[in-house]
């Protein structure tokens, strides 16, 4: 099993190109099931989760062709996928495929909308709390589908097609919003999604669906209106840059010190996180090529942060911020409100010498002068990269094990960091 070896202490200086957003690329690929024409997606990141979803879609009969780089593309330019779901041969998504990635459960929406039936295994993926699919099922039932759970599968049918409806989520749900959005696009009549998630990735998917002939308004607000259409056509769409990758590398620079240009980043996608970094002592400069992050020799300031749905501080940057605050001058407080059981990285950060106390959903981090390298084990995607950030600043050698979590969400992380001066390498075997 691959590991990552880091020798800490080097500042980061240079340019890091930001990849396409995983959290947009996955639902965009799934949206390809909604049409029998070809959907072309540019700037798709090369990630394990993307490859896994290609296998899942292939199981349904979807033909996916990955095109090479075009003239003028950057070395790290994401891949272009041509997705053709002209002939859907199977409406069942089996356990052995879905169990490896939770987002793959979302195929239930386009299969139900277009084929009027679906049988999808209950999902897998990162072990963060329970993440129930109840809200997704509720949304599809509102649209007129009949759903039952049998033998670990959700069996859905809508023989007469889906019908527009009012869907009011009791709490903000990104997954539920994606599923409702895709399903309602081909439903008869008007659908209104209340308390919808406002994340940029939702907006990106809605933009793509509109290019395909959908009639969606209000994406990015808590109220989305969808006028159902009979058919969607092919389109070409570029995946937006990854705000979580942007924030992760910005925090790495704040941790080590240095000067790094995050090429292609869009600051409006993560303003709350950039504000926190500024408060912590980093300097953020917006320019035509993205975001420049610098930190001189001054120490890090402690911060108090509560995770929240967009535009609040992202839960997917919580672990990285905790690693950063492990070296702040004073006590920081981080409260997690989105997912339960999302502090599994605490015990691993403690192996570096971090001082962290948990009280319910709040972590108190008492900064230390220096972290020490250690062998550590990744527990989930975002926790794994927090260990990399800690290792970049720690004295001595750090070995991060179980890095398959990293490969699910970060494209060529060790290469991007190494190009900026970090001593980091992947060890195979």
Curated annotation (Swiss-Prot):
PANTHER family: UDP-N-ACETYLGLUCOSAMINE 1-CARBOXYVINYLTRANSFERASE. InterPro entries: Enolpyruvate_Tfrase_dom, Enolpyruvate_Tfrase_sf, MurA_subfamily, RNA3'P_cycl/enolpyr_Trfase_a/b, UDP_GlcNAc_COvinyl_MurA. One of its GO terms (cellular component) is cytoplasm. Its EC number is 2.5.1.7. The keyword Cytoplasm applies. It comes from Rhodopseudomonas palustris (strain BisB18). The active site is at residue 126. Belongs to the EPSP synthase family. MurA subfamily. UDP-N-acetyl-alpha-D-glucosamine binds at residues 102, 131-135, 316, 338. It catalyses: phosphoenolpyruvate + UDP-N-acetyl-alpha-D-glucosamine = UDP-N-acetyl-3-O-(1-carboxyvinyl)-alpha-D-glucosamine + phosphate. One of its GO terms (biological process) is regulation of cell shape. Pathway: Cell wall biogenesis; peptidoglycan biosynthesis. The modification 2-(S-cysteinyl)pyruvic acid O-phosphothioketal is found at residue 126. GO terms for molecular function: UDP-N-acetylglucosamine 1-carboxyvinyltransferase activity. This is UDP-N-acetylglucosamine 1-carboxyvinyltransferase. It holds the Pfam family EPSP_synthase. It is found in: Cytoplasm. Phosphoenolpyruvate binds at residues 22-23. Cell wall formation. Adds enolpyruvyl to UDP-N-acetylglucosamine. Keywords: Cell cycle, Cell division, Cell shape, Cell wall biogenesis/degradation, Cytoplasm, Peptidoglycan synthesis, Pyruvate, Transferase. It is an enzyme of class 2 (transferase).
């Amino acid at each position: 099993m691959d590991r990552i070896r880091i020798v800490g202490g080097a500042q980061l200086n240079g340019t890091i190109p930001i990849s396409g957003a995983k959290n947009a690329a996955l639902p965009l690929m799934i949206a390809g099931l909604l049409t029998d024409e070809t959907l072309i997606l540019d700037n798709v990141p090369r990630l394990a989760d993307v490859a896994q979803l290609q296998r899942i879609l292939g199981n349904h009969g979807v033909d996916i062709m990955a095109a090479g780089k075009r003239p003028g593309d950057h070395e790290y330019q994401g891949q272009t996928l041509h997705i053709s779901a002209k002939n859907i041969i199977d409406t069942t998504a089996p356990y052995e495929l879905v169990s490896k990635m939770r987002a793959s459960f979302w195929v239930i929406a386009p299969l139900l909308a277009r084929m009027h039936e679906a049988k999808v295994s209950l999902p897998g993926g990162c072990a963060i709390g329970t993440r129930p699919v109840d809200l997704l099922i509720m949304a599809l039932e509102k649209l007129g589908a009949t759903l039952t759970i049998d033998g670990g599968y959700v069996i859905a049918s809508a023989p007469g097609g889906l019908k527009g409806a009012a869907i009011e989520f009791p709490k903000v749900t990104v997954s539920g919003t994606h599923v409702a959005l895709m399903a309602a696009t081909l439903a008869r009549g008007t659908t209104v999604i209340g308390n919808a998630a406002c994340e940029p990735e939702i907006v990106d998917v809605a933009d793509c669906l509109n290019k395909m002939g959908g009639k969606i308004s209000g994406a990015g607000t808590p109220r989305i209106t969808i006028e159902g259409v009979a058919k969607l056509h092919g389109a070409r769409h570029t995946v937006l840059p990854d705000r979580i990758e942007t924030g992760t590398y910005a925090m790495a620079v704040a941790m080590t010190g240095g000067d790094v240009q995050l090429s292609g980043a869009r600051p409006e996608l993560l303003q709350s996180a950039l504000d926190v970094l500024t408060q912590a002592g980093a300097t953020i400069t917006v320019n035509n090529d993205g975001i420049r992050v610098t930190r001189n020799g001054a120490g890090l300031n402690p911060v108090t942060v509560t995770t929240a749905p967009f535009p609040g501080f992202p839960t997917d940057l919580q672990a990285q911020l905790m690693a950063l605050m492990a070296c702040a001058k004073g006590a920081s407080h981080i409260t997690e409100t989105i997912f339960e059981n999302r502090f599994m990285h605490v015990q691993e950060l403690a192996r570096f010498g971090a001082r962290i106390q948990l009280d319910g959903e709040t972590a108190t981090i008492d900064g230390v002068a220096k972290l020490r390298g250690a062998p550590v084990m990744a527990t989930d995607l975002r926790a794994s990269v927090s260990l990399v950030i800690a290792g970049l600043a720690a004295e001595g050698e750090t070995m991060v094990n179980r890095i398959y979590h990293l490969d699910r969400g970060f494209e060529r992380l060790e290469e991007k960091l190494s190009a900026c001066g970090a001593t980091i390498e992947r060890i195979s075997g």
